[in-house]
Amino acid sequence: MTELNKLTLADSIKGLKNKDFTSTELVNAHIQQIEKHKNLNAYVTKTFDLALKGAQIADQNYAQNKARTLEGIPFAAKDLFCTKGIRTTACSNILKNFIPNYESSVTQNIFNNGGVMLGKTNMDEFAMGAANITSCFGNVINPWKANNDNSDLVPGGSSGGSAASVSGFMASAALGSDTGGSVRQPASFTGLVGFKPTYGRCSRYGMVSFASSLDQAGIFTRSVLDSAIMLEAMMGFDEKDSTSLKAEVPQLQSAIGSSVKNMKIGVPLSLGEGSIIEPDVMKMWQDTIELLKNAGTEIVDITLPYAKYGVAVYYVIAPAEASSNLSRYDGVRYGLRVERENMTLDEMYEMTRSAGFGEEVKRRIMIGTYVLSSSCMDAYYLKAQKVRSLVANDFNNAFTKVDTILLPAAPSEAFKIGEKQNDPTIMYLNDLFTIPASLAGLPCVSVPAGLSARGLPLGMQIIGKQLDEYNVLKVASTIESGVKHIKFEPKGF
């Protein structure tokens, strides 16, 4: 029999319903795996007692035929989802001992559906990073290793802990957040399905903010069906979030295995020309195009003329919003406070923020404050907002001709820890292919579609029209079926 922690979420639900095993056994299998692989540093807070209590309730519900959708399924949550009575830090020293007195809407939705939480996962500080190396708890190690090379690799960021937990069989699914690619890029680096829904599909209430017009909850799973199951539980209107969409949650599971015949898939190959895209990634892109052609889709060459400015636009808008959002961390009401005798209020603010924020967060606050200053507002911030509209228009125009768009999730395979650490610009380019869809608020997924020459996973990104998660999952499911001969599983796990 397959080890319980290696079952997909859908197979775990099936096994629990058939009483092949109990939720307590399933949770214990995951706890053992977490303890076995502590060195990956995927979890920053473990809630095993809570998970085992939840598993006992789940077992009772199964015995009484009262099981909910996710009854007894062990999941992990990125440490920026506020969890009532459980430490929530955003992996920053400024919030290192913060315990919220309320629950985020997304975690509450999962609890309401019967999910049990194993713990909170490591992440880049305040979700600012692409390699999970800016956390105050230290970096996360990718469970994957390249062929004939034992070097530690990054899991991607900012949701690196969530990605490592699912890839390393330490959770059935894990919540992440995606602002500019923080679910899709780590999913590509760790061989997972990483889904970011339409902006506003999942409530942002109770999520520690980075850039409010871009932040969206997402999910990591080991199959496309698992993503559909989790999304149905996570999504829905929430009056506590002013950007939440009043849209009915579709029956996403029926998309799995549905025919894509006669669907039109847009391919902006020109976006890959002259970029930092690696040959292995380009080959995967071409192979996926052939796979979809063979499945009966029509491949349409499209252009997204303004998408190439996405990274520049993002690194004006996101830091601007971050500088505003992070101004609340001042040591007055909660979080870290640095004090000494005869200190003025201004000195307390200054010393608290200097001690509490890491280098990357400080860099982005400074950039954001600069672009919002009266002398730079027109030249940078307002111009970036105009180009953001042009990027969104590019997608609107493309979607008059096609149903979905196909792009790599990342320009490279996972790289070594420390490799790009000293050059922020090179690090920012990791999000080259994910940022455009974020700027337009579109639903998108990274699905494992191939291995590099060094045996590392590569993810293909499918982007859909607003609120069209269904077709995104349909195409992702077709790609998943087409590469089922490849084992997307790290060695030694």
Swiss-Prot record:
GO terms for cellular component: glutamyl-tRNA(Gln) amidotransferase complex. GO terms for molecular function: ATP binding; glutaminyl-tRNA synthase (glutamine-hydrolyzing) activity. GO terms for biological process: translation. InterPro entries: Amidase, Amidase_CS, Amidase_dom, AS_sf, GatA. Its EC number is 6.3.5.7. The active site is at K78 (charge relay system), S158 (charge relay system), S182 (acyl-ester intermediate). The keyword Transport does not apply. It catalyses: L-glutamyl-tRNA(Gln) + L-glutamine + ATP + H2O = L-glutaminyl-tRNA(Gln) + L-glutamate + ADP + phosphate + H(+). HAMAP family: GatA (MF_00120). Allows the formation of correctly charged Gln-tRNA(Gln) through the transamidation of misacylated Glu-tRNA(Gln) in organisms which lack glutaminyl-tRNA synthetase. The reaction takes place in the presence of glutamine and ATP through an activated gamma-phospho-Glu-tRNA(Gln). Heterotrimer of A, B and C subunits. Belongs to the amidase family. GatA subfamily. This is Glutamyl-tRNA(Gln) amidotransferase subunit A.
